[in-house]
Amino acid sequence: MRKNTYAMRYIAGQPAERILPPGSFASIGQALPAGAPLSSDEKIRVLVWNIFKQQRAEWLSVLKNFGKDAHLVLLQEAQTTPELVRFATTNYLAADQVPAFVLPQHPSGVMTLSAAHPVYCCPLREREPILRLAKSALVTVYPLPDTRLLMVVNIHAVNFSLGVDVYSKQLLPIGDQIAHHSGPIIMAGDFNAWSRPRMNALYRFAREMSLREVRFTDDQRRKAFGRPLDFVFYRGLNVHEASVLVTRASDHNPLLVEFSPGKPDK
């Protein structure tokens, strides 16, 4: 684990807090006492979006319109600008970001906004071998109303690499986290699965982890070389609804998924 791998936690009225990777898996679910559950009703609403470093207009209105009712917002390429931090801390109990690399003004990386305080937080980074830029991932755990713990993996996969070795290597520590968690799981983000070998590596990983893929009927996901880049995988939950929002506010379209707790239908 590199020494510059950490998460920044943003909570309203508090200074930003730096969180280092936990020392062991034993702390999953024990790092902090479980507070209020992520959702008090029977649904868990999730928004997944590569926000393109907020470079386009309307990104905030999309978040306000579609993110405010979500229990989890999983962003990739999120820059911690004052506007985004203000939205996050105003509408969510916690926002955790893993800076992949520091831009001149604000760090950019994956960011998870949540309606509950995480009881576990593990930041991960992997460097792209060609551009030498890092991509980040974040593993967080939240209490559910039925006392189970939900693991959430927010990932932006490496993009430029020869072969799939580095791509698969980024998934390895995530697999270690999942292997030590017995409860439900949501793994989502921009997987940059633009080639057949990458798709094969991703599906093989999902299969090994017993994760199912969320299917979108009107599939308007961003594609590269004819293949979608953004995915949502899950375990130990039911998919109630899944849709893709078409917008010009980013070069990716947001994914909206509504889960219900409980064992998935066969």
Swiss-Prot record:
Gene Ontology MF terms in the entry: catalytic activity
GO cellular component: cytoplasm
Subcellular localization: Cytoplasm
Keywords for the protein's UniProt record, in alphabetical order: Cytoplasm
Top-level taxon of the source organism: Bacteria
Keyword Chloroplast: no
Primary localization class, coarse: cytoplasm
InterPro entries reported in the protein's UniProt record: Endo/exonu/phosph_ase_sf, Endo/exonuclease/phosphatase, UPF0294
Gene3D superfamilies cross-referenced by the UniProt entry: Endonuclease/exonuclease/phosphatase (3.60.10.10)
Protein family according to the UniProt entry: Belongs to the UPF0294 family.
Cited HAMAP family: UPF0294
Protein name: UPF0294 protein Ent638_0743
Provenance organism: Enterobacter sp. (strain 638)
